[in-house]
C-alpha cells in the first residue's frame, strides 16, 4: 500500500507541473509586441538630436494629445508664467517655470529644476540630476524661484527677481542690483559689483566687499577681512577686524583683488592691477607688484623677497635665493648672483646712500633715495615709497611700509605691520601695537590710542576720544583731553627730532 501511495504522489506532482506550464504559456506575450528598446541605441541618439522648437510645433499640430498624460494626476500647469510645483506635476510652454521634484520642462528660457528632470538649454546647471537646455547662463543651486532676470544665480533656497548678474551663495533674497554677490545669508539691493562674504546686508555701493558679518554701503573698492564697519574714506586699511567701504582698500587676510593699488598681505592671487601687493603666497603678473612670500613675477617693478627667479626685467628683486641677469638695479637679499647690473653693494652688511632704486638684502642703511628697500635691519629717512620688511624706522615719506617694529611720523599713507607709532598723518594704519593721533581714518589692529580723528577703529584694546563714528572691535575706552595734550607734546618732540635729522642728512 505504501508503494502505491508513493506512485500516486508522484503522478499528482507531475499533473500540477503540467497545469502550471500551460497557464504560463497562455500568459506569454507575442514576440512581435517587443519594442526592441534595449536592442538599438540609435533611437536614443536620434531623439537627443531633435530640435526642441520642432517638438513644440508637433505639439501644436496635435492639440488633443497630452504629452504629460503618463504622469500621476497630482496637478497640471499649462500656458502660465512663473508657475511652480513643489512635488510631482506637469508643466508646459511656460517661461521661468520651476519644478522642485520630479518632472519635465521644455520650451522655456531660464528655467530651473532643483531635483530630477530634463532641460533643453545651454549653459544651464541644475544641482540635482537632470539636463538643461535652451537657456543661457542659468544656474540653480537647489530649490528656488527665478523670474525676470538674466544671468542670475541662486546658490540655495531663495528668490531672485529684476536683477542681472546677481549671485546669492546661500539662503536669501536679491533684487534690483547688478553684479551683486552675497556669500551667505542676507539681502542685497540697489548696488553694483557688491560682494558680501558672510551674513549681512549691502546697498548703494559699487565694487564693495565685506569679508565677515556686518553692513556695507556707499563706497567703492572696499574690502573687509573681519567684523566691523567702515565708511566714506579712501585708501583705508584694516589690519585686524573691520570692514572697508572706500576706495583702494586693502585686506590683510585671504582674498583676491582685480584693481589698482590693492594690497593683500595674506594668501591670494592678484592680477590685472598695478602697484598691487601680496604679503603671503601668491603670484602676480602686473607692474609695481610685491610678493614678500614665495612666488614668481614676470613683470617690471616686481618684488618677491622669497624664493624665485627673475629675468629680463628692470627693478626686479628677490629677497631669498635666486638668480638675476640682464637687468638693471637687480638685487638678491640672500645667496645669489648678479650679472650686468648697474647697482653694487654688499649683500650681507652694507650701506647705500644718495641713489635711487637701491636695495640691501641684509643689514644696511638707506637715505635720501626713492623706492628704497631694506630686507633686514635698517633705517630709512626722507624718501618716498620706502619699504622695510624687517626692523627699522621710517619718517617723512609717503607710501612707506614697515612690516615689523618701527616708527612713523608726519607722512601720509604709512603702514607699520607690528609695533609702531604714528602722528599727524592721514590714512595711517598700525595692525599691531601703536598710537595714533591727529589723523583721519586711522586704524590700529591691536592695542593703541586714538584721538581727534574721524572714523577711527581699534581692533583690540584701546582708547578713543573726541571723535565721531568710532568703532572698537573689543574692549575700549575714550576719555579726557590728557591724550590730546600728550599727543601735542609728542608731535612737537618728533618735529624737532626730524628737523635735526634732516639737517644732518
UniProtKB/Swiss-Prot annotation:
Q: Which GO terms describe its cellular component?
A: extracellular region
Extent of Basic and acidic residues compositional bias: 488-505
Query: List-wise, which residues carry Valine amide?
Result: 74
Modification Leucine amide occurs at: 88, 102, 129, 143, 157, 171, 185, 199, 213, 227, 241, 254, 267, 281, 294, 307, 321, 335, 363, 377, 391, 405, 419, 433, 475
Identify residues that carry Pyrrolidone carboxylic acid. 106, 465
At what positions is Glutamic acid 1-amide found? 349
Propeptide positions in this record?
A: 26-62, 495-505
Q: Which residues form the signal peptide?
A: 1-25
Keywords of this protein's UniProt record, alphabetized?
Amidation, Cleavage on pair of basic residues, Neuropeptide, Pyrrolidone carboxylic acid, Secreted, Signal
The listed locations are:
Secreted
Residue ranges of region Disordered? 472-505
Q: What tissue expression does the UniProt record report for this protein?
A: Cholinergic motor neuron B15 innervating buccal muscles in Aplysia.
PTM sites of type Isoleucine amide: 116, 447, 461
Q: Which GO terms describe its biological process?
A: neuropeptide signaling pathway
> Quick one: where is this thing mainly located?
secreted
Answer whether the UniProt record assigns the keyword S-adenosyl-L-methionine to this protein. no
Q: What does this protein do?
A: Modulatory neuropeptide, acting presynaptically on nerve terminals to inhibit acetylcholine release.
Could you tell me what this protein is called?
Buccalin
| Species this chain originates from | Aplysia californica (California sea hare)
* Organism ancestry: Eukaryota, Metazoa, Spiralia, Lophotrochozoa, Mollusca
Amino acid at each position: 500500500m505504501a508503494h502505491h501511495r508513493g506512485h500516486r504522489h508522484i503522478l499528482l506532482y507531475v499533473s500540477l507541473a503540467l497545469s502550471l506550464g500551460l497557464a504560463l504559456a497562455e500568459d506569454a506575450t507575442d514576440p512581435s509586441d517587443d519594442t526592441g528598446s534595449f536592442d538599438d541605441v540609435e533611437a536614443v541618439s536620434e531623439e537627443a538630436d531633435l530640435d526642441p522648437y520642432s517638438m513644440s510645433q508637433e505639439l501644436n499640430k496635435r492639440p488633443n494629445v497630452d504629452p504629460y498624460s503618463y504622469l500621476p494626476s497630482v496637478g497640471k500647469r499649462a500656458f502660465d508664467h512663473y508657475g511652480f510645483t513643489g512635488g510631482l506635476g506637469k508643466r508646459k510652454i511656460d517661461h521661468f517655470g520651476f519644478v522642485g521634484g520630479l518632472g519635465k520642462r521644455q520650451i522655456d528660457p531660464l528655467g530651473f529644476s532643483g531635483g530630477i528632470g530634463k532641460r533643453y538649454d545651454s549653459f544651464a546647471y541644475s544641482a540635482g540630476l537632470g539636463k538643461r537646455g535652451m537657456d543661457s547662463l542659468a544656474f540653480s543651486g537647489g530649490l528656488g524661484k527665478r523670474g525676470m532676470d538674466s544671468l542670475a544665480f541662486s546658490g540655495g533656497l531663495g528668490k531672485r527677481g529684476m536683477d542681472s548678474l546677481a549671485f546669492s551663495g546661500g539662503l536669501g533674497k536679491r533684487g534690483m542690483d547688478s553684479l551683486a554677490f552675497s556669500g551667505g545669508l542676507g539681502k542685497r539691493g540697489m548696488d553694483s559689483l557688491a560682494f558680501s562674504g558672510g551674513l549681512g546686508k549691502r546697498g548703494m555701493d559699487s565694487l564693495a566687499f565685506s569679508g565677515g558679518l556686518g553692513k556695507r554701503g556707499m563706497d567703492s573698492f572696499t574690502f573687509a577681512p573681519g567684523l566691523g564697519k567702515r565708511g566714506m574714506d579712501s585708501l583705508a586699511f584694516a589690519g585686524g577686524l573691520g570692514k572697508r567701504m572706500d576706495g583702494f582698500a586693502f585686506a590683510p587676510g585671504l582674498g583676491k583683488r582685480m584693481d589698482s593699488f590693492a594690497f593683500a598681505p595674506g594668501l591670494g592671487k592678484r592680477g590685472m592691477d598695478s602697484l598691487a601687493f601680496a604679503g603671503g603666497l601668491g603670484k602676480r603678473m602686473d607692474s609695481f607688484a610685491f610678493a614678500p612670500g614665495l612666488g614668481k613675477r614676470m613683470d617690471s617693478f616686481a618684488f618677491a623677497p622669497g624664493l624665485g627667479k627673475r629675468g629680463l626685467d628692470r627693478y626686479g628683486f628677490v629677497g631669498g635665493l635666486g638668480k638675476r641677469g640682464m637687468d638693471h638695479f637687480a638685487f638678491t637679499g640672500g645667496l645669489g648672483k648678479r650679472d650686468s647690473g648697474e647697482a653694487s653693494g654688499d649683500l650681507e652688511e652694507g650701506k647705500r646712500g644718495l641713489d635711487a632704486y637701491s636695495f640691501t638684502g641684509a643689514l644696511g642703511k638707506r637715505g635720501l633715495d626713492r623706492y628704497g628697500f631694506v630686507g633686514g635691519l635698517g633705517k630709512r629717512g626722507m624718501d618716498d615709497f620706502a619699504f622695510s620688511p624687517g626692523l627699522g624706522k621710517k619718517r617723512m615719506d609717503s607710501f612707506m611700509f614697515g612690516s615689523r617694529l618701527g616708527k612713523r611720523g608726519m607722512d601720509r599713507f604709512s603702514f607699520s605691520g607690528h609695533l609702531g607709532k604714528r602722528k599727524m598723518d592721514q590714512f595711517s594704519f598700525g595692525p599691531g601695537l601703536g598710537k595714533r593721533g591727529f589723523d583721519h581714518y586711522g586704524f590700529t589692529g591691536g592695542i593703541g590710542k586714538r584721538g581727534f580723528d574721524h572714523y577711527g577703529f581699534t581692533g583690540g584694546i584701546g582708547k578713543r576720544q573726541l571723535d565721531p563714528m568710532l568703532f572698537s572691535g573689543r574692549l575700549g575706552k575714550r576719555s579726557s583731553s590728557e591724550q590730546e595734550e600728550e599727543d601735542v607734546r609728542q608731535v612737537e618732540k618728533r618735529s624737532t627730532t626730524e628737523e635735526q635729522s634732516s639737517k644732518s642728512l
